[in-house]
Every structure is written in structure tokens, then in C-alpha cells.
């Protein structure tokens, strides 16, 4: 039963992406991106709904042309979660999705074109209260910066970002957030550190093209974990070559590990050894699948023996310590003994019961004011 995070977050300007606050004192938002064909409205809506069920706060959708812009408009009408339109090169696409109700525009002012085109996009955003995300990526730096630095560097990423920030500020536009992504962890981390000292706008964190499910999860957890532990970051996106729903799960797991945001169960489980009195790995795998729908923040300890079991169980809402028989703890106190027969069934029942009690207690507290 872990308490508040000791992390002191960087103070940033609050903006709104649809109904979701970003920056300031708002919770760190978890974002993902669809990988379906935007013109396939049904498939994209289905994917967004799956992301919403997983807990996503904001979803980015690629809008490469005008046909996709019209499809985006239909998608927007069919989903509840705020949508970011990812736009490059053609400023008219940005103007169209602004008319269609987009919640945020992800652009790179450097590839939109002339000053009058950038101004048109900014004016459309301002008129409709739409924020902008400036997205800088190590793989697409401006040619003059590539020539100046020779290769992508943290300083090059930050110079590119500040160039675009100044561009928007010249147009008297302040409702934006910024990202400076790279596939190299150290480059991205240092770029965000430098940028955090230069601007007050919210920062969107990500390690771009991080890799597949396993390798990308590790790289993102290391890179984003370093920044979040320093208080840097207002939204996160875990870029994985995998089902986008996995990005949301990993994002929440990173935030949970730093006590920055809680959603669902925080499992504490031993890796198991020959001292285990039940199959820890099998038990954990079954519990994670069965309890995936549970959104109530709970700490659940699953420890195979009495070496560390009692200590971990005493710190959890629900704890299981292996023994002969096994011992269940509720709110840190021994509650009942269990054999291995129907162990997962009974543990699931107790966890759901505890979750219901927590929901009722929280509701009563709110009602009392």
C-alpha cells in the first residue's frame, strides 16, 4: 500500500487536449497512436475503442491526405477519447481537420511551408481553441541543422524545437506542447533535460522507434523512467512495433512503478525458486489475464514462500504467501489459509471483493465532502 510519489514534477503551463488537461498539476497523460489505415473508418474506430478500454487518455491518428482528413472527421464523431491529427507538409489538411473538430494538431512548422501557411494553421487553432504539438524527431531534422551538427545530437534536437517554439510565439500562440524524440535513449533524455530548462510548455515524452514489444518496452522504461523520476514530462507515448494497446499497458506500468499514477493492479511477485509452495508464474499469468478489466488501484503481492512473503504481503492490499498451507493477507493482516486447490479462483474473488470495498469507501468519502 504505497503512498504518494516523492517526485517533484517540473512546473509547466497547462493546456487542454479536448477534455484532458496536460501540464500544470494535471496527471501525466498516457497517449497512443493508431496503426490502422485512417481511411478504414470502422477499423480505426474499433482500435480507438480498444485503446480507450485500456485506459488511453489521448489518441494520435495519422492524416496523410485529404481523403484521410474526411475519414478523420467521421472517426471523430464516433469516439469519445480526444484525438490528435498527425499532419506533415500540407497545411490545408490541418485547416480541414480543425473544421472537423480535431482536439490537437501535431505539426512540424518547418515542413508546413511559408510563413503565411503556418499563420493560417495557427489562426485556425486559436479560433477553435485547439492546441498544437511541435514534434521534433532525430530522424527528420532540418538540413541546415544536419549540416551544422554533422549528425543528430541533443543540442540539434533542442535547437530545432526552440526554432519552432519561437515561430509559434511570434504568432502570439502559447497553447502548445513539445516533443524531442530519438531512438537513442541517451540522446532523447539529454534533449528533454535541456529543453525543460528553456521553455514552460508541457513536454510530451517518447523514445521514437523504440523497437518491438520486449526491446521497445525496455528502452522506453529506461528512457522515460529517467526523465519522469526527475519530474520531467506531462504526457507519454510508448512507441512499440506491436498492438497499440500494449503501449497503453506499458505506459501505465511505468507510471505505477514511479507512483505517479495508479490504474489497475500493481502486482508484486517473486520470480520463484525451488522454495515456492505453489506455481508462482502460472498463478501470475492467470491473474493478470483474469483481472485485466479491474481499474481500481490495488497492490497485490504474490510470493511463493515465507522468506519474503510475509513482509511483502503486509504492505499490500491483498497478499499471498506460499506455505503449508498458503496464507492470505488483507490490508497487511493475516486473513485466511488456502491450499493450492482453486488458489487462483479464490485469490481472484478476494481481490475483486477488496476492489469493491475500496470503491465503496472512496465513494463514501467523497459523499461526506
UniProtKB/Swiss-Prot annotation:
Reactions catalysed, as given in the entry: (2E)-4-hydroxy-3-methylbut-2-enyl diphosphate + oxidized [flavodoxin] + H2O + 2 H(+) = 2-C-methyl-D-erythritol 2,4-cyclic diphosphate + reduced [flavodoxin]
GO MF annotation list: 4 iron, 4 sulfur cluster binding; 4-hydroxy-3-methylbut-2-en-1-yl diphosphate synthase activity (ferredoxin); 4-hydroxy-3-methylbut-2-enyl-diphosphate synthase activity (flavodoxin); iron ion binding
Entry's Gene Ontology BP terms: isopentenyl diphosphate biosynthetic process, methylerythritol 4-phosphate pathway; terpenoid biosynthetic process
Binding locations of [4Fe-4S] cluster: 270, 273, 305, 312
UniProt cofactor(s): [4Fe-4S] cluster
Family to which the UniProt record says this protein belongs: Belongs to the IspG family.
Record-linked NCBIfam families: ispG_gcpE, PRK00366.1
Protein name, per record: 4-hydroxy-3-methylbut-2-en-1-yl diphosphate synthase (flavodoxin)
Species of provenance: Pseudomonas fluorescens (strain SBW25)
Amino acid at each position: 500500500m504505497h503512498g504518494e510519489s516523492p517526485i517533484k514534477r517540473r512546473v509547466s503551463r497547462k493546456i487542454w487536449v479536448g477534455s484532458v488537461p496536460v501540464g500544470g498539476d494535471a496527471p501525466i497523460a498516457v497517449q497512443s497512436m493508431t496503426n490502422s489505415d485512417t481511411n478504414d473508418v470502422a477499423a480505426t474506430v474499433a482500435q480507438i475503442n480498444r485503446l480507450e478500454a485500456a485506459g488511453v487518455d489521448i489518441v494520435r491518428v495519422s492524416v496523410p491526405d485529404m481523403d484521410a482528413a474526411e475519414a478523420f472527421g467521421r472517426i471523430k464523431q464516433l469516439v469519445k477519447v480526444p484525438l490528435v491529427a498527425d499532419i506533415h507538409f500540407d497545411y490545408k489538411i490541418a485547416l480541414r481537420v480543425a473544421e472537423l473538430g480535431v482536439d490537437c494538431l501535431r505539426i512540424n512548422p518547418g515542413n508546413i511551408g511559408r510563413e503565411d501557411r503556418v499563420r493560417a494553421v495557427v489562426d485556425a487553432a486559436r479560433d477553435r481553441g485547439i492546441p498544437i504539438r511541435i514534434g521534433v524527431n532525430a530522424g527528420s531534422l532540418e538540413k541546415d541543422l544536419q549540416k551544422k551538427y554533422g549528425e543528430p545530437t541533443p543540442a540539434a534536437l533542442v535547437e530545432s524545437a526552440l526554432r519552432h517554439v519561437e515561430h509559434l510565439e511570434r504568432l502570439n500562440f502559447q497553447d502548445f506542447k513539445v516533443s524531442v524524440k530519438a531512438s537513442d535513449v541517451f540522446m532523447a533524455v539529454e534533449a528533454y533535460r535541456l529543453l525543460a530548462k528553456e521553455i514552460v510548455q508541457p513536454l510530451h515524452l517518447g523514445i521514437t522507434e523504440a523497437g518491438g514489444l520486449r526491446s521497445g518496452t525496455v528502452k522506453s522504461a529506461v528512457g522515460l523512467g529517467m526523465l519522469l523520476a526527475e519530474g520531467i514530462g506531462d504526457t507519454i507515448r510508448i512507441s512499440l512495433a506491436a498492438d497499440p494497446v500494449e503501449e497503453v499497458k506499458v505506459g501505465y506500468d511505468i507510471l505505477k512503478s514511479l507512483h505517479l499514477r495508479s490504474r489497475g493492479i500493481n502486482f508484486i511477485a517473486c520470480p520463484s525458486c525451488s522454495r515456492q509452495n505453489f506455481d508462482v508464474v502460472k498463478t501470475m499469468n492467470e491473474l493478470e489475464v483474469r483481472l485485466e478489466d479491474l481499474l481500481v488501484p490495488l497492490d497485490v503481492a504474490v510470493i511463493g514462500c515465507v522468506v519474503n512473503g510475509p513482509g511483502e504481503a503486509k504492505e499490500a492490499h491483498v497478499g499471498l504467501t506460499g506455505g503449508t498451507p498458503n496464507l492470505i493477507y488483507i490490508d497487511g493482516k493475516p486473513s485466511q489459509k488456502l491450499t493450492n486447490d482453486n488458489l487462483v479462483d479464490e485469490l481472484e474473488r478476494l481481490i475483486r471483493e477488496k476492489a469493491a470495498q475500496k470503491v465503496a469507501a472512496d465513494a463514501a468519502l467523497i459523499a461526506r465532502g
